[in-house]
Amino acid sequence: MCIRDSGYLDTYNDYDNKTVSIGENINGLGVISTYNNNSKQTSSMGAINDGTGKLTIFDSEGRETLNLVRSLTTFNQDGKITGKYGTNNSGNGSVFLYDRFGNRGWYKTGKNS
């Protein structure tokens, strides 16, 4: 099987709900997405514009809860960022914590002060 020019392949369960989609994202890059029994997206794995891989996890309602690109980013049930763990521009490890509204509350870097 060969699908060209913005093609994708979807699979469906016995209830006619989409379960998996394999193909291209809006930027023409590869992506695989999974869905639950309510047709809500549960995960997405693929490439982004700079060629980096990206993994996104969604809750049962299709809301983003975890994003892994160059850092691990978490979100609450309202879609607000709650934490970020990764590497800062200087190459040091960094951790950000946010309140339930997405406001930054705490930051720490691995470099000794």
Go through the PLM ranges and name each one:
Residues 1-3:
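Short, small-residue-biased leader/transition segments that mark boundaries at the very start
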Residues 97-113:
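Short, low-complexity, Pro/Ser/Thr/Gly-rich segments in the mature regions of secreted, periplasmic
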Residues 9-12, 18-22, 30-35, 42-45, ...:
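Fold-core signature of tandem repeat domains
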